[in-house]
């Protein structure tokens, strides 16, 4: 069940069976630059493999098999209590199972599930594109006798990267919102695949007061 990731559901599921086997292995690398002449940073890289056995006992990538994960956090302290920080993240494309469009289009199936049925004969055979994001933050601190004031500007996803996940599978609808029947088979609906993207620039202004 854990391998289903965000696709976990209850409609049509069979009793849980612990007969499958899985394994995960990899390599981690970390380098740190402690504060030196105003500069600091941490670089972390992970090479990972995560897989489990399918219904035929063959190893396939798990939903968490991202392969390459990179994280870089760095900053510089300027004079007069100004500070600039950046963070970059990269996660390689993760596997997902494509839809069984033949089964999903059957009216009696769709009317019950209201969603696409995964094709377990092609378990985790596709991958979403890699995800990456760059964040930027600027801080200015004023120190007083018994307290300090920190004003900051934080901009996440500064270059507005649009991440892509498993596409949506849905039925085509007419202008009244009713499902359209396949003209070549009255027992099926017409389906359509819609892109599933997310991501936007997120600026934040904040104030921190320390006593």
Predicted segments with their positions:
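Gram-negative outer-membrane beta-barrel transporters
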Residues: 2-93
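Extracytoplasmic loops and strand-loop junctions of Gram-negative outer membrane beta-barrel proteins
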Residues: 9-16, 53-57, 116-123, 186-192
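Short sequence motifs at beta-strands and strand-loop junctions characteristic
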Residues: 11, 19-24, 62-66, 124-133, ...
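Hydrophobic, lipid-facing positions within transmembrane beta-strands of outer-membrane proteins
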Residues: 25-29, 68-74, 132-138, 201-207
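C-terminal beta-signal and adjacent terminal beta-strands/loops
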Residues: 41, 90-113, 129-133, 140-211
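A generic structural signal for solvent-exposed, polar alpha-helical segments
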Residues: 51, 70, 82, 102-105, ...
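Active-site rim elements
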Residues: 59-60, 120-127, 137-140, 192-194
């Amino acid at each position: 069940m854990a391998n289903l990731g965000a696709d976990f559901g209850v409609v049509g599921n069979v009793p849980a069976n612990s007969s499958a086997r899985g394994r995960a292995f990899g390599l981690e690398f970390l380098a740190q630059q402690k504060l030196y002449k105003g500069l600091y940073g941490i670089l972390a890289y992970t090479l990972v493999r995560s897989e489990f056995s399918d219904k035929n006992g063959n190893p396939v990538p798990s939903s968490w098999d991202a392969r390459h994960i990179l994280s870089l956090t760095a900053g510089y302290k300027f004079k007069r209590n100004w500070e600039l920080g950046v963070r970059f993240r990269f996660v390689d494309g993760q596997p997902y199972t494509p839809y069984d469009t033949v089964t999903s289009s059957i009216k009696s199936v769709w009317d019950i599930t209201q969603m696409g049925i995964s094709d377990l004969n092609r378990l985790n055979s596709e991958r979403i594109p890699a995800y990456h994001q760059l964040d930027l933050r600027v801080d200015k601190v004023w120190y007083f006798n018994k307290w300090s004031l920190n004003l900051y500007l934080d901009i996440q996803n500064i270059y507005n990267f649009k991440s892509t996940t498993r596409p949506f599978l849905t039925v085509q609808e007419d202008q009244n919102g009713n499902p359209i029947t396949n003209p070549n088979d009255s027992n099926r609906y017409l389906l359509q695949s819609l892109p599933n993207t997310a991501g936007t620039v997120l600026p934040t202004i904040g104030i921190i007061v320390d006593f």
